[in-house]
Amino acid sequence: MEDMLSFWDVAIYFSAEEWECLGPAQWKLYRDVMLENYSNLVFLGLASSKPYLVTFLEQIQEPSDVKRQAAITVHPGGKCYTCKECGKGFEHKKVYQNHRRIHLRVKSYKCEECGKSFRFPSLLSAHKRNHTGQKPYNCEICSKAFHVPSLLSVHKRIHRVQKPYKSEDYGKTLHCPSLLSQHKIVHTGEKPYQCEDLGKAFRYPSRLSNHKKIHTGEKPHKCEVCGKAFDYPSRLSNHKRIHTGEKPYKCEVCGKAFHDPSKLSQHKIIHTGEKPYKCEVCGKTFHYPSILSKHKIIHTKENLCKCDICGKAFHYPLLLSQHKIVHTGEKPYKCEDCGKAFYYPSRLSRHKKIHTGEKPYKCEVCGKAFYYLSILSKHMIVHTEENPYKCEVCGKAFDYPSRLSNHKKIHTEDKPHKCEVCGNAFCFSSSLRKHKIIHTGEKPYKCDICGKAFGSPSRLSKHNKIHTEDKPYKCEVCGKAFHFPSLLLVHKRIHTGEKPYKCEVCGKAFYCLSTLSVHKRIHTGEYAYKCEVCGKAFHCLSTLSVHKRIHTQEKPYKCEVCGQAFHASSKLSHHKRIHSGEKPHKCEICGKSFYYPSRLSKHKVIHTGEKPYHSQASGKTLDYPSRHSKPKTIKTGEKPNKCEICGKAFSFPSLLSIHKRIHIGEKPYNCEVCGKAFRNPSRLSNHKKIHTGEKPYKCEICGKAFDYPSLLSKHKIIHTGEKPYHSEVCGKAFSYSSRISKDKKICTGEKP
C-alpha cells in the first residue's frame, strides 16, 4: 500500500513568501485545484479520511486562515524528491514519477479493449470494470453495486439523506462538492467546453468527451444478442432490455412501462402538459431543452456554412460535410448482405434491420411491429385519428408538421424542381427524383415472388402487400379492408360524400388530391406520359403502365373463378362482380342497379333526357360520349387490333379479345337460370332480361318499352321521321345504318 497516492502527494505547497504574493484570482485557483485533487482521490477510493485542510477549503475560509492551517498541516521536511515544475516534494521515488506524468501528460497505461490511455494504473483498473461489468462495491442497505468505492460513498448519502453542500444562490443541497460545482454552472448558463467540429458547447468536460464519440464513431460496447454497438455502457444496458422485454420504469399515472428512465421522464410530461423551455424570440414553449435548441436555429440563421456547389446552407460544418457527399456520389457505407451503399452510417444501421428482421417497436393497440420508433409514432395516429396540424387556406388537417409544409406548396404553386428532359416542374426534390425514372427506365427494386421491378423501394413495399393480402385497415361502414391507412381515409369519403379537392376551372370536386391533379390535365391538354410503341399519350404514369400491357400481352390479374386474366387490377375487380352478382351502384329514380358507377351515370341520362355530347361529323347531339367517339373511329377506318387467325381487324383491343373466343369456342359467362353460355358479359346481361321480363327503357310518346337504350333510340326515329344515313350508291336516305348495307347489295346486284 506504500505506493498508493495520498492527498499530500497531490497537494500544492507554497512557501511563506509565495503565500504573500497570492492575489484573489490565484487564491481561488489554489482552492479549486486542491478540492478537485481530493475529489479525484475519493473517486478512486484512495482517501481513507478527509484532511482538515480540505474541510477548511470547503467552508470557504479567508486566505489567511487557510495559510495558517496549511502551515500547521503540511510538513515540509523529509521529502528528498522535489518537482522542478511546481516545487512539490515527495518521500518516495515512484510517487514522484507518477506525479511527473501530470506535467508531461504521459498516459502509459492503455486499455486493451478500447485503446483508452491513463496516467495511473489505478485509473486503468477502475476503467476496465466498465468492460467486464464487475461491480465489487455493494450497498449494505439496497444491495446496489458500483465500479468504484467513491460512487458507493456518494450513493450511501441517499439513504442518510445527507446533503452537506449547499448552493448559496438557490439553497439547493447536494451530496458532494463536485456536484455542487456542477450545479452552479446551471444557474450561470456557462458552457466552456466547445466541440471543434460542430461548435456545440457543453457545461462539463465529460459531456464533451461523450459527444465527440459521435464524430469518431467509437462504439466499444457491443450487444451479444444482435451485435449492435453503443458508445456508452448505460445505452447497452437499456438496449438489452429490448431482447429481454424488461420494462422496469413504470408511469404512475397510466401504468405504461419503459426500457430506460429517460423515456419515462419524457413520457410524464404528456400528463402534466408542462413545457418549461420557452423561446425568447417567438414565445413558443417546448417539453425539452434539446428541441428548444433546434428551434432557435430557425430565428438566428447565423454562421451558416454554405455549399459551394448548390448553395444550400447549414448551421454546422459537420452537416455541410455530410451534405457534400451527395454531390460526389460517394457512398462509403456498404451493406455486407446485399451490397447496397449509403451516404451515412446511420442510414446503413437502419437498413440492416431489414435483413435481421428486427422490429423492436410494437404497437400496443393492434400489435403491429416496426423497425424504427419514428414509424411507430406515425402509426399510432391511425388509431387516435389525431390531425393537429391544420392548413389555414383550405382547412385540411395533417398528423405531422412536415406534411402540412409539403401541402402548403400546393396553394403557392411553387415548383422549384424542374426536369431537364421534359421541363416538368415539381414541388419537392423527391418527386423530381421519382419522375426522372420515367426517362431512364431504371427499376432497381425487384419483387422476389413475381419478379416485377419498381423504380422506388416504397412502390415495391406497396406491391409486396398484394402477395401477403395483409389488409389491417378496415372500413367500419362497409367492412372493406385496405393495405394503407391513407387509402382507408380516401375510401371513407365515399360514405360521407366529402370531396375536399375542387377544380378551379370547371368546379368539379374529387375525393383525393391525385385524382384532381390528373383531372387538371384535361383542361391544360397535358399528356406527359407517352407510349414508345404506338405513340399514344396519357395524363398519368399509372395509365401508361396499364396501357403498355396491351403491347406486351401481360395480364397479371387473374380471376380465381373462371381463370380470365386482365391487364389492370380494376378490370379484375369489376369482372368479379359478374360472378358475385354484386351491383352496388343503384339508380335513385327507378331503382335499377349497376356493376360500375360509369354505367349508372350513363343510365341517368335516360331519365334526364340530357344530351351533352355533340358530334362534329354529323352535327347530332348524343347522350353518351361513346356514341360520339365510336363513329369517329369507324369513319377514319382505324382498326389497329388484328386477329392473327382470320385477319379481322377491330377498333379496340377489348373487341379483339371477345372475337378470339369464337375461334377457341370459349364462353365463360353462364346464365344461372337456363345454363346458356355467352362470350362476353354484356350479352349475358341482355339475355337475363328474357327471364326477368324487364324493359326499363320506355318511349315518352307512345309508351312502348324496350330492353335496351339502343332499341329505344332506334324506335324514336319512327316518331321523328329522321333519316340520317345516306347511300353513297343511289343517294337514298334511311333511318338505320343497317338499311344502307342492304340497299348497297340491291343497287350493285350483289347476292347476300
Curated annotation (Swiss-Prot):
UniProt region (Disordered), positions on chain: 611-636
Organism per entry: Mus musculus (Mouse)
Entry-linked InterPro entries: KRAB, KRAB_dom_sf, Znf_C2H2_sf, Znf_C2H2_type
Gene3D superfamilies, per the entry: 6.10.140.140, Classic Zinc Finger
PANTHER family for the chain: KRAB AND ZINC FINGER DOMAIN-CONTAINING, ZINC FINGER PROTEIN 737-LIKE-RELATED
Gene that this sequence comes from: Znf728
One matching Pfam family: zf-C2H2
SUPFAM superfamilies reported in the protein's UniProt record: beta-beta-alpha zinc fingers, KRAB domain (Kruppel-associated box)
Domain KRAB: 5-76
C2H2-type zinc finger locations on the chain: 81-103, 109-131, 137-159, 165-187, 193-215, 221-243, 249-271, 277-299, 305-327, 333-355, 361-383, 389-411, 417-439, 445-467, 473-495, 501-523, 529-551, 557-579, 585-607, 641-663, 669-691, 697-719, 725-747
SMART domains reported in the protein's UniProt record: KRAB, ZnF_C2H2
Top-rank taxon, per record: Eukaryota
Name of the protein: Zinc finger protein 728
GO biological process, alphabetically ordered: regulation of DNA-templated transcription
Example of a GO MF term: zinc ion binding
Annotated keywords: Metal-binding, Repeat, Zinc, Zinc-finger
